[in-house]
Amino acid sequence: MLHPRARTMLLLSLPAVAIGIASSLILIVVMKIASVLQNLLWQRLPGTLGIAQDSPLWIIGVLTLTGIAVGLVIRFSQGHAGPDPACEPLIGAPVPPSALPGLIVALILGLAGGVSLGPEHPIMTINIALAVAIGARLLPRVNRMEWTILASAGTIGALFGTPVAAALIFSQTLNGSSEVPLWDRLFAPLMAAAAGALTTGLFFHPHFSLPIAHYGQMEMTDILSGAIVAAIAIAAGMVAVWCLPRLHAMMNQMKNPVLVLGIGGFILGILGVIGGPVSLFKGLDEMQQMVANQAFSTSDYFLLAVIKLAALVVAAASGFRGGRIFPAVFVGVALGLMLHEHVPAVPAAITVSCAILGIVLVVTRDGWLSLFMAAVVVPNTTLLPLLCIVMLPAWLLLAGKPMMMVNRPKQQPPHDNV
């Protein structure tokens, strides 16, 4: 016979698995549609018209039209495509289901059009809203927070292809003063995360790891080097943190999402022309291309890091629907490769992983997620002790500093007033 605690854990296991599978399937369908549209916009259409896909006019034109299209969706769709991601954390309160169609369309347009944001925030919003709405009908005794936790865990598992990230994140958020053991509370979220990760793995494998030279043995000087690299990445990230709310306020003075996002798309197009096609889109596939291109120099990596960080700030400030984690990882990789090219004595494994740790820590202010992203992009167990040590001064630097998020005004924002 099972203990009552075990029966309590099993009670939510079936809904957890269902939510994990559904979270993954929603992500897969959205990404597939965006991929088809991206291929049409950036491969087939310019080929048919006899225009090079890296033509400045094409890049600026597509991104400007993408901004206008997303602005029209936000302007006229019910619920105005959900909340502005610049004002929201990764895991937020559930939104009304009526806002989801507009949010899905805005997300797909942004992903396909080359906007420098990832899918993580909108997908999280969609899955949480659906889980809460459906779960409240089927099992009204279960509170909204439980559905929110299960949906966010399933989405994290689906996004990263492993339940490890969910385990790390929720080990701190669920660790309250309750007498219920932590792993009892983690059971259902981990079931959801595992189901989401396994479902994603059936269709495609998220490819985060980079082909970077193996790091052999940790030395004391490597800790100092890693801390300096993380500090440089944090400094770059804090510039973006300072710029985001100011640019957001300036852009939203126009009070018209079509105009705001059209201008935002135009600026992104100019940045894309300067940085080239590798600086477009969410950044995961592009960072693989960046590492594979042996022709890039120190100045090229620096330019890509600056352009991508600027594009991230512009896209977020303009109100595009997307997340900031994936493009931040690209910035970390570019910074790390630049620092390795500048000081070849410091292994690329250290510069890249510590730069990712620093920049993701600025964006998320989540130590576990930052460690996870650094470890999966540069998968080397020898680096784990070094990353844990480097995390300590990095966390000290960011203690009490503002987050990369805009404080929502007391009144409704312009996009929701329209």
UniProtKB/Swiss-Prot annotation:
Topology of the protein relative to the lipid bilayer: Multi-pass membrane protein
GO terms, molecular function: chloride transmembrane transporter activity; monoatomic ion channel activity
Residues that span the membrane, as ranges: 10-30, 54-74, 99-119, 120-140, 149-169, 186-206, 223-243, 258-278, 300-320, 322-342, 343-363, 371-391
Subcellular location: Cell membrane
CDD domains in alphabetical order: Voltage_gated_ClC (cd00400)
Keywords: Cell membrane, Ion channel, Ion transport, Membrane, Transmembrane, Transmembrane helix, Transport
Disulphide-bridged cysteine pairs: none
Entry GO CC: plasma membrane
Coiled coil: none
Classification via NCBIfam families: PRK03655.1
Family (UniProt): Belongs to the chloride channel (TC 2.A.49) family.
Annotated protein name in UniProt: Putative ion-transport protein YfeO
Organism of origin: Shigella boydii serotype 4 (strain Sb227)
Lineage per the UniProt record: Bacteria, Pseudomonadati, Pseudomonadota, Gammaproteobacteria, Enterobacterales
Gene encoding the protein: yfeO
